[in-house]
Amino acid sequence: MVSLEKNDHLMLARQLPLKSVALILAGGRGTRLKDLTNKRAKPAVHFGGKFRIIDFALSNCINSGIRRMGVITQYQSHTLVQHIQRGWSFFNEEMNEFVDLLPAQQRMKGENWYRGTADAVTQNLDIIRRYKAEYVVILAGDHIYKQDYSRMLIDHVEKGARCTVACMPVPIEEASAFGVMAVDENDKIIEFVEKPANPPSMPNDPSKSLASMGIYVFDADYLYELLEEDDRDENSSHDFGKDLIPKITEAGLAYAHPFPLSCVQSDPDAEPYWRDVGTLKAYWKANLDLASVVPELDMYDRNWPIRTYNESLPPAKFVQDRSGSHGMTLNSLVSGGCVISGSVVVQSVLFSRVRVNSFCNIDSAVLLPEVWVGRSCRLRRCVIDRACVIPEGMVIGENAEEDARRFYRSEEGIVLVTREMLRKLGHKQER
């Protein structure tokens, strides 16, 4: 383990990102989000009033000083590709800055799409090697968080690791959804199990397990060697968590990086924020959390901006209807192009170009772009997919049986509404 002085840290914080390339795994469908991902990959799902989920990983790279990125796509990639082309095309290729789109290509070697997360990188090795990076940062494109990857790179170099895995404690009852690890006093990973049925607890806290966040730093040459070896293994599932990380752990070359060391927060005393919005409830709740008085995730931090494609839109407008009732909102996010006419919006998130007509009550709802809500509607505890036309007088979120019959209703009572569901009920979706 190498001990570094403060000046060395500052120098490495500038140099290491320039020697790195980030690969963002963005090909997943996200089946637990149900119909919300029928026509888009999970990283392309809207979030936080104006963003897409992938914007967080991309923004973290830019803010960390990493200016070379590859986005690996597969499932329903058109929306994602379009978003990146529109919103992330400001790089200067002459300065060796870029976002490369790396779709599944079914190369001549075989007819397989990506067989796993590791295989997604393997199938693009010929392209990735051209980047001539010393370090490769592997990221999931479907998580919400703010992290300074330069701090993780420094930790990787300081510990003399060949592979570093970002980790954080999670409640033990949720740990079966993650890779779970045990570490020694130097953060060397001594055991790693992917999605165990009975996850081991942390020695100092039996209520929690130490979980992998799916964020990795590799020495580039070591990663390429591992991937080529894994590609030849017919018994491998070609997945980082299931195959590569356990193998590296056995070799004694994997180290853990505690997420609090690189989590970017405005309040240093706050709990580190990282969310996998992979279920409808988690997605709904994470959106509504941003509308709270003091949200856990600070979206207004000028030192760590979240970038996205910014469409030219007029400001949101709140107007009275013909009867004189005023449009108003409380504890909500309302994006550009929205018009709220004589209705009440409480604890909700309205994306761009949403129109709420008179006499409506919107409570704890997430309305994606271009939703049109007819007069006298009541929407509660729901997610309304893009461009839905909610007919006059419709009530959602008040009658569990009625909601389950018409739409998708989660076990926690969150209702998902899509254009296809409304069409099946006989409601026209064209205006």
Swiss-Prot record:
Regulation: Allosterically activated by fructose-1,6-bisphosphate (F16BP) and inhibited by AMP.
Oligomer status and interactors: Homotetramer.
SUPFAM superfamilies noted in UniProt: Nucleotide-diphospho-sugar transferases, Trimeric LpxA-like enzymes
Bridged cysteine pairs (disulfide): none
Pathway(s) of this molecule: Glycan biosynthesis; glycogen biosynthesis
Family: Belongs to the bacterial/plant glucose-1-phosphate adenylyltransferase family.
One of the record's GO molecular function terms: ATP binding
One record GO biological process: glycogen biosynthetic process
Organism of derivation: Shigella boydii serotype 18 (strain CDC 3083-94 / BS512)
HAMAP family to which the protein is assigned, alphabetical: GlgC (MF_00624)
Descriptive protein name: Glucose-1-phosphate adenylyltransferase
Positions of alpha-D-glucose 1-phosphate binding: Y114, G179, E194, K195, S212
